[in-house]
Amino acid sequence: MRGKFITLEGIDGAGKTTHLRWLEYFLKERGKNVMVTREPGGTPLGEALRDILLDSRQTMHAETEALLMFAARREHLDKVILPALSRGEWVISDRFTDASFAYQGGGRGLSLQKLNELECWVQGEFQPDVTLYLDVSIASGRQRTSNIRQADRFEKEQDEFFRRVREAYLERAKEFPERIRVIDANQSLEDVRRSVEKSIATIYA
């Protein structure tokens, strides 16, 4: 039996890592074989591209950024995600294609047509079974990440960039309401966990 593919999305500080690890535990407790991965990354090539993409010393054209993201994603699908799903494993990914529409589309201003073409080329009709978008205010996200580590190339962007990213995520959620579940990540930890559990209830039965 094919496994399930769950993705978590949100700006930095939304709590993706925290809730991803809880979700991994939650599913394992219910007898699921779970693989956790991330984007960009997940493969040796993907991790090398991640280092380039996040390096705050790097500058690149927005289209270059998008192409590198989708190149990493193609490898990720081929080497990690699709084989795991075919083995019946449940795959949880910290970000996937919705992030490209939010960051490169909303944030960088790339046309949705170009991103749609890349999406179709790289993954065809393949989509996550469910996407959890953790929606947090930009101020809260900044506050949560301010003292964690040195900011990467994306985290150094101005608030206006993240406003566009957040708006793009919300527009994407309106476009695909059956797949993308918007969760208020400004809530308490327990309330967010309850929302996550409710959002995946239809696929883990």
UniProtKB/Swiss-Prot annotation:
Gene Ontology annotations for the cellular component aspect, listed alphabetically: cytosol
Top-level EC class as recorded in UniProt: transferase
Reaction catalysed by this enzyme: dTMP + ATP = dTDP + ADP
Binding positions for ATP per the UniProt entry: 10-17
EC number: 2.7.4.9
Keywords of the record: ATP-binding, Kinase, Nucleotide biosynthesis, Nucleotide-binding, Transferase
GO molecular function: ATP binding; dTMP kinase activity
One GO term of the biological process aspect: dTDP biosynthetic process
A Pfam family assignment: Thymidylate_kin
Function: Phosphorylation of dTMP to form dTDP in both de novo and salvage pathways of dTTP synthesis.
Family statement drawn from the similarity comment of this UniProt entry: Belongs to the thymidylate kinase family.
Protein name: Thymidylate kinase
Lineage summary: Bacteria, Pseudomonadati, Pseudomonadota, Betaproteobacteria, Nitrosomonadales
Gene coding for it: tmk
